[in-house]
């Protein structure tokens, strides 16, 4: 793994670590009782370590001196230490699990809330696999900042100090051996933590890319099969997987070197202490029991330093994970409340686009000084070539994107003055690509209006001409439709989406090629249903079929972000212009009542 100056600078960047900890700290504070308990058990564990060494030394001296009365008195203490140790380990482990699991739960909910409140363009410009990776790889990698590791960052220095002071109490001369261990362990731990943090950052990034690859494979499985792309996608994933293996092996190698080196240092300290101690014992300056207690503790003296370096490396690894989700969590929104559904909706709303200018990237403008007025309760169809901006108008009207200049009005109120709840309650939308959620047909329909009665549900389904089909299924409205409605045809999904829009009962209706997936017979039936719900509602239609748009109040034609034609179908089809060009129809051959599909 190549390291550069930026990696080294980042490792010692206090602001970066403080920034990451500022995200975690409120969650730690929320569960302070659990961490207070962990601190109590931390101190208890240190006392048990020292008490065990004292017990071993005292028991050894009693045995050497033949003081069996003392031995008998010490045995109950041994069982007491075992019991306290058992309870400490059990409670400590359980409370740690409660704390870490609760914090991960809270963090996942906080992350999802932020994403659900995010502007649509931020979600659209981020790969779904990367977003999912935040909830899996990243959050599952923060243990180093919230779990046992965090407690050990406090415990291990205290344990080292306690052991060193106790060793100095037993033999000041021998305790100096431990002083030589400190600089070696600290330097080794710093290097280890630096290397592990950088490789961990690369692993998290690579895991995100692999999750994205898998997401694309499963979502585009039909295309992969149709175009014989199995080998290509498998090779891409295998290459990523091999890179991940290389990084994991690198981490394993570094850990092996570090822990093996730590054990070697501990063994050297043990042998030196044992040899020097034997000399001191032979001169009567130390008892055998004291030497045994010293050697036992000196062997553990390396553990806090060795462990501290490892825990610090884990902390750094967790910092890398928090860095990846920090940009999402730190965004401040005007409200943290989700939009709420409202039953009370006015029946008619006028729409206005006034001198509106919009660009997705700030360079290529989709609309420049665009103006359009739609009277309340009227219906219009938008026609234009691919890329003219038809769907962009829908995105702007729903508040998914904001214009760079100008304003969009509903009645006389600017969109910017409406809350998300107010705006979304005014609009029912049937997208070009129908999306149904995993669950039953009933659950998908009720998403539009949770307070829908059974009668209203059936009425909407009948209006969309989907009721009879639903009843023909073995479980009717309780039929599970699979992921994205995979068990249904395109037309069936489209009609469920239309029924869902009917149930929302909003004053503004947006139909983005809402009948594109229907056959001619079903389209005729749905067209009748749409004509019914379009009455007294302001409706905007994007369509490719003549039958869908010929009965609207007005058709507008846009090209390069400008309104270039408007009028009824009968007028526009006989006028030279883009509308007639897109229709590919000779006006002299078109009868007034023909129901012919045209490409618009």
Language-model regions, residue ranges each:
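Cytoplasmic juxtamembrane "membrane-exit" helices immediately C-terminal to transmembrane segments
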Residues: 94-98, 102, 106, 169, ...
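ABC-type nucleotide-binding domain
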Residues: 344-600
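Transmembrane helices of ABC transporter permease
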Residues: 30, 34-45, 58, 76, ...
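Short intracellular "coupling" helices and adjacent cytoplasmic loop segments at the cytosolic face
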Residues: 2-14, 101, 109-133, 137-139, ...
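Membrane-integrated ABC transporters
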Residues: 1-48, 64-77, 92-96, 100, ...
